[in-house]
């Protein structure tokens, strides 16, 4: 969660094992941590299962979904995850399939019943591949089909204002944006320059 009240207008929140580890949180407090986030966020909150088998992921998913009405269960895009996603979605539990890096993965996630699919942008850039192009391919491919349920694409691993811009242009439904990048999205040097000029001109009016 952000330390700024401005973040209260963000539509969706995400967690994953790495983000939680960075908080220094304890395993025993993880569920309480998710509950606290859900209490302050009006929209969906993605909470990730760390299980590796179908049955264990389903068990985790049910436990996470029981924490709050706005929990979305995050599941890695893998064979066991696809099977668990199908089962959970049939129970009415929304799933966000994460760690998606290809069009075939995204299509299979949607067919399994995933409500959200999270292709990672920044991690492609880390290995000198174009993450935005990969995101565009996923968006285009998923939009080609009617899966019989709503599917939204989350641009994940977004690291800059340019990533946000490109994700919007490519048609991603949602972007997960760290607070530092979110602040940069609001800032522009011409805005600062214009505001400075306005204030100086207003001072002249006051002194007239």
Predicted feature locations:
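C-terminal alpha-helical cap/extension of soluble enzyme domains
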Residues: 142-208
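Catalytic beta/alpha-barrel core
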Residues: 46-52, 70-79, 94-107, 118-128, ...
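Conserved, mostly hydrophobic/aromatic
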Residues: 16, 73, 109, 167, ...
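Single conserved hydrophobic/aromatic residue that forms the stacking wall/gate
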Residues: 1-7, 11
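Catalytic cores of alpha/beta
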Residues: 8, 56-60, 104-111, 159-172
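Glycine-rich phosphate-binding active-site loops on the catalytic face of alpha/beta enzymes
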Residues: 13, 17-20, 117-127, 172-191
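Alpha-helix-loop-beta-strand connector modules within alpha/beta enzyme cores
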Residues: 31-45, 82-91, 132-149, 200-201
